[in-house]
Amino acid sequence: SYADLIVQIKKTAAALQALGVKKGDIITVVSVMTPEVVYTFYAADLLGATLNLVDPRYSAEGIREYIEEVESRLLICLNVVYPRCHQAAKRTSVERVVVLSPADSLPLAKAVGYKLTEPDKNRYASNVLRWKAFIAAGKGHSPAAVPYDPQHTCVVVHTGGTTGSPKGVMLTDYCFNALAQEFAAKSRLFHRGQKLLNVMPPFIAYGYSCGIHMPLVMGLHIIIIPNLDPEKLGALVWKYKPAHMFGVPTHYQQLAADPLLKNKDLSFIRNYAAGGDSLSLGAEQTVNRFLKAHGVEYPLAKGYGMTEVASAATVAAGTNNKLGSVGIPLVNTLVSVFEPDTEKELPIGERGELCISGPTTMKGYYNKPDETDMILRRHPDGDNHCHNFGGDARAYVRSSCTYK
């Protein structure tokens, strides 16, 4: 329940405070999406701290680089990646490590079953706290929320970017809140109490902004799948019957080909959206035929965005969904097509470089001002525009946009 979520966030905030976390600190998190990671996201924000989100598939050396970049004193990781994280944290600023397990949020019977089938064979160092011991350490602490600062960096999300080297994208509280409000203002498809299936990881902006924060703001019930087996996606959809899902195009191609869903009534689906990767016209048509044949009212939703704008900037959903288009801009978001490497806006129908300006625009790249200045440029209108280099976009008369 939402009441329990608030309780868990406060307990996590107390535990973080007990470990000395304070405003301005950056906590590195190496994990898939779990309830504990969600609690940590909001608990850190309550204290004015920031999460540095790292893909658990990285090597020990890769994890070390991201730890060193932000100088984290606290590392939170999934138990299955602890050996790599232990190696990564050596000779870094890390002082304490908190280890979580997929069993931490399971009911007792399931947790026991999980531990029997997936025993934890790690040998933990003396600076490690398991999640339950970590939470227990917070007893007696009652942290007060820091005053709301819209420009507070709540997460650093890493991306290879379009200009070469990996970069840490700083997304603010305002970015996440604005995106949630943009969806709320634009879409009539989301209603309090509906279910959303979250199959996206926390270390991409799409996973947190669209998969966690936006649905919570709208009062949705989120079903978290920490480590999706694509072969079981159809079974999950049929079991939980979620009205909403955010995924990548291959997820929906998998659903369309799943024999389990043959002849099933899927009319409970309201808005299944594809992002995070390219969607071919043929794949879109295949998925749309599947949805229509199974009683779904609307075709596959899709959009366009970048990590640098907290994931989505345009959306094609519901009845406003043209085949092959990435849709229209979200509320308060300006999407324009410019002559490459210039500030010259192109007429409707001409191809050029896509530029995005709006409330979800990143604060910048962490400790990389030169790279930030390359992609965030102040145009004559006085706004910062996020340039997407190497893309090919075209705007149409009804504000629809295609991107290749």
Show the residue positions of the predicted features:
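Conserved AMP-binding/adenylate-forming
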Residues: 2-4, 8, 12-58, 70
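Conserved adenylate-forming
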Residues: 16-22, 139-151, 156-198
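Structural core segment of the AMP-binding/adenylate-forming
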Residues: 18-19, 46-133
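Conserved ATP-binding/catalytic segment of the ANL
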Residues: 19, 30, 344-349, 355-404
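Short hydrophobic alpha-helices that are characteristic scaffold elements of the AMP-binding
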Residues: 42-47, 69, 204, 213-217
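Conserved ATP-dependent adenylate/AMP-binding module captured primarily in the ANL superfamily
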Residues: 58-92, 179-197, 229-243
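Conserved AMP-binding/adenylation subdomain of ANL enzymes
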Residues: 177-195, 203-246, 254, 258-259
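Gly/Ser/Thr-rich phosphate-binding loop
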Residues: 243-247, 256-323, 334
